[in-house]
Structure formats: C-alpha cells, structure tokens
C-alpha cells in the first residue's frame, strides 16, 4: 500500500534539513593577488536593499616614492610573504589644510564647509601613500543579486582565477570595475573620505578609490629633464595597471574599467583619456564638474612656481656658470636635488599661492604624459576610443561669489565652519529667500567682473575695457538690474559658465563630433534638509549627521554647488550617519541617489546609462519616480541633448547655449585673437598665471590672454629676447629653458599683435559715407517715384461728345429751379473746369482709368490758369483716398492708391522702404496682393530714414 503523500513530503523535508547548509562567508576573506595575499573585512550595510560588501583597504599599488624615488615616476610594488592585512586605511599623501593656502573656489562645497571633519581623515600622513581601497559586492541580500566571487577564502585560499574555483561561471560573473579619482585642486584630499560600499552593493560593481601624490610631491616641474612633473597622473596610471593585473582576483572584469572623478579628479580623468600611457587600461570615463580645458586644469608656468618654492624652502641655488655680478640664474638639477633633501611636511607647508583661477602645482604639458595642449589633443581625436559621460552642476561657481554682499563673512561655506557657518544675517537663519542681506552691490559686481577679466585676460589697452563692459552687459539681469540678489545670481552664472560649463560643452562637442558615445547631464539638486541624524526610509538609513554647521543654514541662492553630486553618486544617503556630508537627507534625496547610482553603474556596464537596469526606486516611494519615463539621449554637437537631473527630470537641448557661444566664440574675437588663431599665447595666457609675484594674494592684478575656443588653450611660448635675458631657470645641461626672474624680467614677453584700431576707424568712416550716399539716392528715387505717381494717377478723362442743346419745349417741360448765387458760381466753376478738361485733353493728358476727372492732371496741364471761384469741397471729399475706385479700367491696369501708404496693401516697392508697410498695390488683373511686411527698412536693420 503506497505511503500517503503527506508522509512522503515530511520525509523529503527531513532529509533536506539533515543535509549540512553551506557555511556563512567568513568575516575576513582572503584573496590572492599577483603580489601576495590580502585579508579584507566583510561589512554589512543598513537596510534590506543593500547587501554586504567586502572591503580591502590600504592595498599598495606602487613602491613608496621616497628618497631617490621622489619626483620620479612610480614603480610596481614589491611582493610580500604571508597574508597582508587590508582592513585599515593607509596613510594619506602629505598635504596642508591651511585655510589661507586652500584653493577654496575649486574645492567641493562639502569639503571646504567641513574642514574639521576632513582633518580627521588626513591626520596620518606619509610620503609612502600610494595605496588604493577596493569595495567588492557579495551576498544574496543585494538589490541586484550578486554571486560572491570572493568566496575563495576557504581552506587553501585558492585564487578565484583558478578554473577549479567557479570556472566558466566565475568568468561570466565578472563585474565591472569603477576607479574613482578624488578631487581637491591637486593639493589636498584623499580617497579615504569616500566610502564606495553603497555604490558597489547597489550597482553590483567593484569600486576602487585611489590615493595619489599631491601638490609639490605630485606635480613639481622645472620644465626640463630635471623634474618633468605629472607624477600624480603617473600614480593614477600605475593604479590602473594594478587593477588590470589583479581585477580578476576580486571577480572584476579588466575589460570593463571605468574611471570617474569630480573637480580636479575629473580633470585628471579628462587628461588620462588624452595620454598614450593609459591606452587599454580603461574603456569608459565619467567626468564630473571639470575637464582638461578649464583654466585651472593645467599649469603652463611650472618652472616659475618651482623657483618660487625653492626660494621659500631655501633651495635657491645660483647657476655656477653665471658670470659674477649678473642676475643669478637657476640650476634646475641642483634645485631638484635640494628639494629631495627636504622633509615632505616642509614642502607641503610651503605656501606658494597661484594666480586666481590657476594652480601652482598641477598637471603640465611635458611632451610625454601630456604630449600637447589638451585642446589640440582633443581636436586630433586622441580620446575618441573612450565612451564619455560628463556634466556640470547648476551653481558650480557659488564659491567664487562666497563672501560678497553685506552680512557675510565667508558665505554659506563660512571658510571653515559648515554651510552657513559664517552667515550672520537673520534672514538666512530664518529661512529667508535671499540667503544673505543685500546680495551683491553694484560696486561689488563691477569689481568682481573687472577682477575676473583682469586675472584671466589681462589689461590690454582698449580691448580690455570693451571686454569687461561686454561681460557686464551679458551678465546683467536687465529685467531686475537694480536687485542685489539678481546681481549675485548672475555672478554665480558667470563663474559657472566660464570655469565649468563652456569647457564641458567644448569637450562634449569635440568628443561627439565623430560619433563617439557621449552623454551630458546638468545636476540641479541639492539637499535642503536640516542637520542632525534622522530616521530610516523603508529600511534605508535616511539621516546623516549634520556635520559642522549643518545644511539648514545654507542659503537658497547657492543652488547645486561644486561637488554636490558626489554624495549622490556614492549613495551617502543610504549609508547612515556620517560626519562629512552635513545634511539630513529626505526620501527625495534617497530616491535621487538611487537614480544617479543606477545611471553611473549602467554606464560602467554597457556604456549606456539607460541599460541594463531600469530605474526603479519603489523601495523609497510607493509610486514610480519620474526617471522611469525618461530616456537619456546621446549628445551630439548639433542637437546637444542633455539630461536635467533633479526632482523633475527631463531631456533638454543646448545647455546655456547663448552663454557658451559667448565664451567660446565671441570673447576670443573681442579679445583680438581671431586674426591669429595659430599663435601660441604669452605666459600671461588664461591657462597660465598672470605675471608677477607667484605668492601674491589671489585676486590681485595680472595679465593674461587666451586663444579662441574654448577660451583657455595654449601654453606659454618665450621669445628669443626673453630666452637671452639670462634671468630664467636653466638646466645644468644647458637646455635653455627659461623662466621669469625678478620684477624687471618676470614676465615672458608677449608676442606683438597688430593694432587694428586704424583699419576699424577707416572701415566705419567708409561705411557711414556709403550709408549717407544710399540715403540720398533713395530720397531722390522716392521723390521721382512720388512725382510720377501724381502725374500718372491724376489725369482727366477724354472730353464727352457734344450734345445738342435741349429744345425749348423740353426746357419748358422740365424747368430748373434757380440755384441762386452760389449755384450760379458753381456752374461757372463747372464751365471753367470743363473748358480746362477739354484743353487738357487736347494737350494729350489722357484718361486715368477711374472714370472721373484727374484733378492733378488738370492742374498739371493748365498750370498757368487759376480758378476764379472758390474750390468745391464736396468734390474734395468725394475724391478722398477712401473713395478712390479700386477696380482697374481693364486688364493689365494697376491702380496705386495713395491711401494705402502706411496701411495695408502690397509689398514694399524698395528693399529699404521708409513707409510703415510699403506702398499698397490694390491689385493686378483683379488679383489682390499679399500684405506688406513689417515697418522697418530691412529685416535686420534698425535704421529709419
């Protein structure tokens, strides 16, 4: 008898439960790399949406750059025996968070606003700092179910690349790798600040954050072989080599590597796409708020700042070959040797302040890592092999305006006290709409614009004033020109457009010109919540500690400032309380962060931010978000489509097109560079710092020039006279590389450019003369046409045939009443007119086709005859323009109606018609013509005669 079905089910369940379940993954997994084994730590993330992540922290990717390796390219790391602990962060690269030395305008808003919190991450500094951090997703609790390919940590610690461990399944499950380059104006910052766990778990990607050499140690250059510079960029390239070699050990795909960064990190990413050293190391790039075309992206005067550094730290070594009594030269090799002997902290603390909108120590055009000017490389298509996604934030330039206006001392950033830490205005604290009392005054506006133009374009005679006035005109809100708040808003737009938007659009145009996949975004959201912790959102931590100062004091005018997209990219809103990003995030913030992470990781997977994972944030809201209905279109130079990222997303086109065209097209022409587009600029170019003391305070005067498109282009070129001045730095090998020295010879000579003021004056004079002659000719033509019209359309009809006088009988049958004296005078006038008409007809004046007497023609035909009676005003009223018959006498006859002048009717009889709507043509062969055009003399003219 068969067993009952319930009994069989119970037996099966018992057998299944008797089998041993797989052991839970260990809390400290071990992975074998090419250089040795690493022990990481498995971290659980809050909420039901995020799965666990394995972190490998402080992993060396290069040998320590100490001793003789200082100011040298990085070398691969040495192997180690045993298992290396990778559960703690490694020391950060030397830097100095001095408020006076920070380039705050180019720092992320959250960085500058929370220096006290940032300082905690950079306390442990060492020149041995070339380490990276890995965040590897794993576990079945993640939103995107991910296989734990790091499960090679049992028993013998086998390598996951071994076919015996996972085999083809492990190879098929390899995850994309996203390598993050942190920002900080090349002088400060660390990858340890940003936690990649949430991004890795939510997007199912491996996230790598990289520390690289900063400031003097990372970017010192003498302009010759003694110190070529770009060591920080070479560190990043070495990190990418390490990822290529070892990504498989962590389950990553070395053929799907995406490099992304924000601010100075974005500029580094942009430069990496142009360097042949990084070919094959990554396939996609995400450039957030910064490109290689910005004025602060590349340093074109490295030797000048190297010399200034030597003077600061006591390494000003005279050239032994210089004759006695001559200005001391500079031996670059001796300078570098001296700097190698200095402590790293001393070099980091040395204050060498760059010119405004420039950097003292940053990437340089060395002919090797960066072989040429970035714009030239882009125009040559050096970066077309990469898929690129790039964009800007709405209010990138807010920090440039920070501190302007009454009631401020440091603005929303406070220059060291959190958002609003320095704000004293009651309206801001009370949540007023303006954010600061008084906004920006007219004087402050003029000074800000003048300083901006002077620092970037110099003070060329004549053209500088015209350029300043043009910029003021373009960035004046003429609908509210007297409003201080409007001035502040337009100033933010000015700095944003010039420093971020125009370079980004120029980069996108150059990349998409030949069809390379390009996506552009504009980020329009910032946190509006108050400081302090908060509750969770459906299993996702929704509160982040208020940090320093708190977001509640951040004024409304700040918009989405520089760096505000970073916490949304890394999912800080889901990670729980923190101390760097000071805001209590709302449900909308959590939703938008999920959206941004989906876009970023989709792009890393496929090169298309729309796939393979669809937008879905129902874990935050019960209803779908608006991004589910938006398809992010590719960018192309013609359509210029971009995604507006905010709570109301939409795909739009031509982001700030008018202002971008102003900076990329008009400003270079206004500055007089269009006549010589191939000429290299002087050392005072916009990409190069203005001449003068490199340690002057930012905002001081300086000269500068730029070439067209995108307005910050070319490196310095020195004239023979400046090379022979003997006041610059020369290498020991006699390379002849020259830098300025002293006030008398501090500036590299500017190439002589032709003055076009005389030609312009002559052109204007000739044009005015031709215009006057045209006006005279037109007036004469009009007079002749008017006279001809009167002569043609006032001609009398032919005389009527003679009629027999009425008989006396008929007269008796129809007696006429006596008209009286007036009537008799009218009759007399009629007789006179009849006689005049007959005489005119005999003179050949003809018929006017209207059927009435042409008074003008009569008077013209018998000009010598004067009427002996008063005029008949009834006739005048009948022959008013409104009563002129409109039908022609026959085919082909055209009647010109004087009443149509200035009214309706046909088109103008001349291209520069002075009438309101042209001379009206009633009709030709019975067909009415179209209405006249507008009243201006020409469609593109404002001249009235």
Swiss-Prot record:
Subcellular location: Cell membrane; Postsynaptic cell membrane
Extracellular compartment residues: 19-761
Reported consequences of knocking out the gene: Mice are viable and fertile with no obvious sensory deficits or major perturbations of behavior, but show subtle changes in synaptic signal transmission and signal processing. Mice display subtle deficits in reciprocal social interactions and communication. They have reduced brain volume.
Topological relation to the membrane, as annotated: Single-pass type I membrane protein
GO biological process: brainstem development; cerebellum development; male courtship behavior; negative regulation of excitatory postsynaptic potential; organ growth; presynaptic membrane assembly; social behavior; territorial aggressive behavior
GO cellular component, one term: glycinergic synapse
S-S bridge residues: 93-129, 315-338, 527-583
Signal peptide: 1-18
Region (Disordered): 145-167, 685-742, 787-828
Topological domains, Cytoplasmic: 783-945
GO molecular function, one term: neurexin family protein binding
Biased composition (Basic and acidic residues): 145-162
InterPro entries linked to this entry: AB_hydrolase_fold (IPR029058), CarbesteraseB (IPR002018), Carboxylesterase_B_CS (IPR019819), Neuroligin/BSAL (IPR051093)
Biological function: Cell surface protein involved in cell-cell-interactions via its interactions with neurexin family members. Plays a role in the formation or maintenance of synaptic junctions via its interactions (via the extracellular domains) with neurexin family members. Plays a role in synaptic signal transmission.
Protein name as annotated: Neuroligin 4-like
Organism of derivation: Mus musculus
Taxonomic lineage: Eukaryota, Metazoa, Chordata, Craniata, Vertebrata
